[in-house]
Structure formats: C-alpha cells, structure tokens
Amino acid sequence: MNRFLSHVTNRIDAKGRVSVPSVFRAVLLEAGVRELYCFQDFVFPAISVGGPELLDRFEKQMAAEDPFSDAANEMSLLVHGGGVYVKLDPEGRLMVTDFIRDFTGISNDVTFVGRGDHFQLWDPQAFARAQAEAREGRKQRGLRSQ
C-alpha cells in the first residue's frame, strides 16, 4: 500500500479540521512522512499534498534550469510561493486554512483525491466536474476512461 488511490469526502468539523482518510494516513505512515508539503496545483483548483520528496522533485527540476530563466522563476513562484508545510494532529486531522479554502473554494466538505505519489484536496463539486471533463476528454480522443 504505497500509493494514494481512490477518493474520499470528509466533513470539516466546527474547529476547521478535517480527518485525512485512514488509507491515506497509512501510506504516509509507511513512508515515514511527518510533515506534509502542500502547494496550489498548477492546473486544477486543488491543493496537492505529499511528503518532502514532492518538493524535492520540483526543486530538482528547477536546479536543472538556468536559475535566472523564466522557467525557473515561474516554477519557484508556484512551488515556493504557492506552498506551505502542514502537520497532522494526533488524530490524523489537518486544519483547513484560508490558504486551502481561498484557492479551492472548499467550504464544508473536502474530497481527498489520490494521485499516486501524492494526494489532493478538492471541493467535492469541483472534483466531480473535473473527473467528468477528464472522462469526456478521453472519450473525445478515442481513449478508454475505465
């Protein structure tokens, strides 16, 4: 169980916390991840979440670029300027901060979406629309969606 798979919707509690699904917490535990790196996704209205290796991957891409290039500067603005570290509380919950809410439109519920080596936080309706659009896009290109 070393991949983030499926999707789960959980309600935000009165204190602004949401429980990370147990299957996702198990992947984090297996990987020894204690601190989560979160950033505003480059394409979708979602927050991408993973361990330190997620940030490392982007920093390796930036290191391969000329540090003064537009590509490196744009990546840094997105990865560093659009990123934060968060920790889960002892019960496996995370705070749904303004950083998360403002970018995603999340209000009462969070859909956790597995993306293989990381997961994302979505507004449930936005995720349903994006998934439907992805299926339709694959259909239009003659690709199977299932």
From Swiss-Prot:
GO terms for biological process: negative regulation of DNA-templated transcription initiation. GO terms for molecular function: DNA-binding transcription factor activity; transcription cis-regulatory region binding. Belongs to the MraZ family. It comes from Rhizobium meliloti (strain 1021) (Ensifer meliloti). PANTHER family: TRANSCRIPTIONAL REGULATOR MRAZ (PTHR34701:SF1). Residues 7-54, 83-126 form the SpoVT-AbrB domain. Pfam families: MraZ (PF02381). Forms oligomers. The keyword Magnesium does not apply. This is Transcriptional regulator MraZ. The gene is mraZ. It is found in: Cytoplasm, Nucleoid. GO terms for cellular component: cytoplasm; nucleoid. PROSITE patterns: SPOVT_ABRB. Keywords: Cytoplasm, DNA-binding, Repeat, Transcription, Transcription regulation. SUPFAM superfamilies: AbrB/MazE/MraZ-like (SSF89447).
